[in-house]
Amino acid sequence: MAEKRNIFLVGPMGAGKSTIGRQLAQLLNMEFIDSDNEIEQRAGADISWIFDIEGEDGFRKREERIINELTQKQGIVLSTGGGAILSKETRNHLSARGIVIYLQTTVDKQFERTQRDKKRPLLQGVEDVRKVLEDLAQVRNPLYEEVADITLPTDEQSAKLMASHIVELIDNFNS
């Protein structure tokens, strides 16, 4: 079985980070933490509200602080927000403190998975959601690739299968 090294999931919104992360933590008997949920709990407000009040910069500063703190824990599976990798400091913390898995997805699949989700501040009130997703991918995908130890496409398999596959990859990665 994989040793209890931290596992950090990165990737765009709608890639399945939270869903796969929960399954993975269960398989490995590790604690699962979703950084977005942690931010909301500590702020006592949802992310959309934080974006409205503090702007994206304010949110990113909160996110950077909280991820810095969370990545210092031991034996966790951490699902990060899609934009967490925009911070060089966050990328450095992720790389230094665990195995980083980039959950890759296509813009088409993202569009399909996020179109009914009202909790995506970067997609609120947007005319052309697909264009926003494409623009985000252009900026962020190279950063996900830069920080990743392992890259996995998530479009075709269930979260349970993905989690099992990650366990195998981590065993190989650790040996």
From Swiss-Prot:
Q: What's an example of a GO molecular-function annotation for this chain?
A: ATP binding
Entry GO terms, CC: cytosol
Record's superkingdom? Bacteria
Q: Pathway listed for it?
A: Metabolic intermediate biosynthesis; chorismate biosynthesis; chorismate from D-erythrose 4-phosphate and phosphoenolpyruvate: step 5/7
Would the keyword Glycoprotein be found if you checked this record's keyword annotation?
no
This chain's protein is named Shikimate kinase
Write the Enzyme Commission number(s) for this entry.
2.7.1.71
Q: Where does it live in the cell?
A: Cytoplasm
Q: What class of enzyme is it?
A: transferase
Gene coding for it: aroK
Q: How does it assemble?
A: Monomer.
> Which reactions are catalysed by this chain?
shikimate + ATP = 3-phosphoshikimate + ADP + H(+)
The entry's substrate-binding residues are D36, R60, G82, R140
